[in-house]
């Protein structure tokens, strides 16, 4: 809602904007592409439009899904190539942010996990729920990524705010893991029954949107700065 966006910027007059809102479920984006464009691209453009009045530092949260999954440890300067519509819309959002007249930063991250604080479930919370209910949990074991602990991501964003850092930044963990690896580690830590975890391949699920099989970022730029 453009009027709502306009009103918020006029009333709050922020010095920093952290734009993390998105339609972020790949299958939903694939099924309803107009809605994905409206939320992920048009929504971003509207925020940039009204931010440009007083020009706060603009931070945009993006994703490893802007890459095609043929290699890992991507650096910020590498050319994106999304393989699904969600990644496509996030890349369009990135490009819009890069045209912003004031200072901006794009923060790409990977498979965020931790306490959802009322948000949607992640691999850790799903593992706990399934295994505490004694349910079999089928978890993909042929997608490799560098998962991101939510508190590490938050600390990275705070550093960008404090330093008013600009440009593209990759913020994620250092260790390559599959979703199954994460679920197994969670179950072991919580002393839950790991025998309820079943390794499956990406093709086991009838997912509409293609997922990158190999992902993850080189975070040396963020570490240095």
PLM regions: where:
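C-terminal amphipathic/interface module of NAD(P)-dependent oxidoreductases
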Residues: 210-225
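NAD(P)-dependent short-chain dehydrogenase/reductase
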Residues: 95-145, 152, 158
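SDR active-site strand-loop-helix element
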Residues: 17-21, 58-63, 68, 107-109
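NAD(P)H-binding glycine-rich loop region in Rossmannoid oxidoreductase-like domains
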Residues: 2-39
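A short helix->loop->beta-strand "cap" motif at the edges of active sites that frequently abuts
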Residues: 53-57
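Catalytic helix-loop patch of NAD(P)-dependent Rossmann-fold dehydrogenases
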Residues: 31, 38, 42-46, 66-107, ...
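Mid/C-terminal beta-alpha module of Rossmann-like enzyme folds, strongest
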Residues: 156, 163-209, 213-214
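Hydrophobic "lid"/C-terminal helical patch
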Residues: 9, 127, 157-161, 183-186, ...
């Amino acid at each position: 809602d453009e009027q709502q966006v306009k009103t918020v910027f006029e009333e709050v007059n922020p010095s920093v904007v952290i734009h993390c809102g998105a339609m972020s479920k790949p299958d939903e984006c694939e099924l309803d592409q107009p809605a994905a464009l409206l939320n992920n691209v048009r929504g971003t453009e509207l925020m940039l439009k009204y931010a440009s009045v007083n020009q706060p530092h603009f931070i945009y949260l993006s994703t490893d899904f802007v890459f095609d999954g043929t290699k890992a440890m991507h650096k910020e300067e590498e050319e994106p190539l999304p393989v699904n519509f969600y990644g496509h819309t996030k890349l369009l959002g990135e490009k819009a942010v890069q045209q912003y007249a004031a200072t901006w930063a794009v923060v790409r991250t990977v498979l965020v996990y931790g306490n959802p604080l009322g948000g949607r479930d992640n691999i850790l919370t799903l593992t706990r729920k399934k295994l505490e209910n004694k349910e079999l949990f089928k978890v993909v074991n042929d997608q490799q990524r560098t998962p991101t602990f939510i508190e590490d991501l938050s600390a990275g964003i705070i550093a960008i705010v404090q330093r008013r850092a600009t440009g593209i930044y990759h913020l994620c963990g250092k260790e390559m893991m599959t979703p199954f690896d994460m679920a197994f580690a969670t179950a072991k830590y919580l002393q839950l029954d790991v025998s309820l975890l079943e390794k499956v391949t990406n093709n086991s699920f009838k997912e509409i949107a293609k997922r990158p099989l190999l992902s993850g970022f080189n975070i040396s730029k963020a570490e240095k700065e």
